């Protein structure tokens, strides 16, 4: 009885801690907030502009907590492995983080992370994450792990929010592929 009650309490606590991230994201059908931000591709600085990227096709904006952290390393590596599949669909991938932004130049070029295959943007003060309702509840100055697929008209067509990095690439690639068949 005590064990059952303890497990139920732990389950409730887990739901309260982790569920808000999935609920907080902007909804499918909403207009994606426009942004520009300092970014890095293969260690080279540039300014990423969502409006410019959308002129080329759909954009995957994936928010991640911080460079050089275990889950974020995995997620970046998975995106780098799949980047050719995104490019085949004329999609741009941009990672956005408010955490450890001073490490993004290295993170963007390291082969075990982004491998120079896609850009990552610095979100100083989490201003972009706030617009996208993608703040990490447990550490409000950092981005949550939430991925958006935005069609070329600027409309959000897919949202996936989960602290585990493992399904973000599959979820976003499936959504981008579905756009191509429309």
Model-derived regions: residue spans:
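Chalcogenol-based redox active-site neighborhoods
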Residues: 20-182
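Positively charged n-region of N-terminal signal peptides that target proteins for export
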Residues: 1-6
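Bacterial N-terminal signal peptides
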Residues: 8-19
